[in-house]
A protein has these predicted regions:
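Gly/Ala-rich beta-loop-alpha elbow adjacent to hydrolase catalytic centers
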Residues: 142-146, 150
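Short, surface-exposed "cap/lid" segments of acyl-processing enzymes
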Residues: 56, 61-95
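N-terminal cap/lid segment of alpha/beta-hydrolase-fold proteins
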Residues: 33-54
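Alpha/beta-hydrolase active-site loop
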Residues: 111-132
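The alpha/beta-hydrolase serine catalytic core
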Residues: 111-114, 160-264, 268-292, 296
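Bacterial N-terminal signal peptides
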Residues: 19-28
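Short beta-to-alpha linker loops that shape the active-site pocket of alpha/beta-hydrolase fold enzymes
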Residues: 94-101, 171, 273-274
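Cap/lid segment of the alpha/beta-hydrolase catalytic domain
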Residues: 97-114
Length: 303
């Protein structure tokens, strides 16, 4: 299904009162009204997430940031705050990217040894935590590269009760195929020689991603075809995937939008929006997410 959203509304959201029972309190709480969780993962690292408590009888919502970002990134923060007004429990994790207790975004030139699979294990940690709080299912929302993560997680863990995936600004590979192929060949060669040194790669928006071969290859694997394959598998499982994109997003093109139309449950284009970096279309996006959540909830409520 293909829909266009042109709603000009910029509605004010009623603040939600949240019980301030916190596992850790920072001097400045970056997401309005959210508590900040700091939990230790099985590998010993501390993992950080924004958390807003909601109705345990409804699916919890996990909101994941884009590549190398955090829940403090403006787009992610807006999504978390706006969804919280609907009464859902929200968790917005920071992927650690190999750094215990990571709070800030990570630079492209920083040393990267983390992998895509490491990220999926951390998502699984937070989904497990939500299940322990009494939520029977979860809805996964990803922004930008966070969409690849939630697709990968849902595909590789078919027994996890994911009610739906919402991919906001689902990007395609941003490097030309010859460039990507050359980089992959070099990284594979280094890996075969057991060369674990950090080397520069072009990846996502990074012109210089300083990563180990294993780190780079784990993300480079998620090219356009890999995303389409994931969407196809979820389509075969009849698991709904909703894509929301901006009509002025320079990181997408018409060819990619047509691919999404073929493989996602529903694609919504918000007129005038870019990668949702601007707050100008914040409430248009919020309205669309609210409508999608109503669609997801309808079968469960027998409507």
């Amino acid at each position: 299904m293909w829909t266009r959203s042109t709603s000009p509304r910029a509605r004010q959201r009623r603040p939600v009162l949240v019980a301030w029972v916190m596992l850790m309190l920072f001097s400045a709480n970056p997401v309005g009204y959210a508590e900040t969780l700091k939990l230790q993962s099985p590998d010993g690292k501390f993992l950080i997430a924004a958390h807003l408590r909601g109705d345990v009888k409804r699916p919890a919502i996990l909101v994941l940031h884009g590549f190398l970002q955090s829940f403090q990134f403006q787009t992610t923060e807006n999504i978390i705050n706006n969804l919280s007004s609907l009464g859902y429990t929200i968790v917005g994790p920071n992927l650690s990217l190999g750094i215990s207790g990571r709070l800030q975004s990570m630079q492209c030139q920083a040393p990267h040894s983390h992998t895509f699979d490491d990220d999926l294990r951390e998502i699984d940690f937070w989904v497990g935590w939500l299940r322990k709080q009494g939520h029977a299912s979860v809805i996964l929302v990803g922004h930008s590269w966070g969409s690849q993560h939630v697709l990968g997680y849902t595909e590789t863990r078919p027994k996890t009760p994911v009610a739906a995936v919402i991919a906001v600004s689902l990007v395609r590979a941003e490097q030309a195929a010859p460039v990507r192929a050359k980089q992959i060949a070099k990284a594979q060669g280094r890996a075969a020689r057991r060369d674990l040194s950090l080397q520069p790669y072009a990846l996502s928006f990074c012109k210089t991603f300083m990563g180990t071969p294993r780190s780079y290859l784990s993300y480079a694997h998620w090219d356009d075809q890999r995303v389409i394959d994931s969407l196809t598998r979820l389509q075969e499982r009849k698991l709904p995937v909703y894509a929301v994109i901006g009509s002025q997003d320079k990181r997408l093109d018409d060819e990619w939008v047509q691919e999404l139309r073929r493989h996602a449950t529903q694609v919504t284009v918000i007129e005038g929006a870019n990668h949702f970096f601007s707050s100008f279309h914040e409430f248009d996006l919020s309205d669309r997410l609210e409508a999608i959540l109503a669609q997801i909830g309808a079968p469960a409520n027998g409507k």
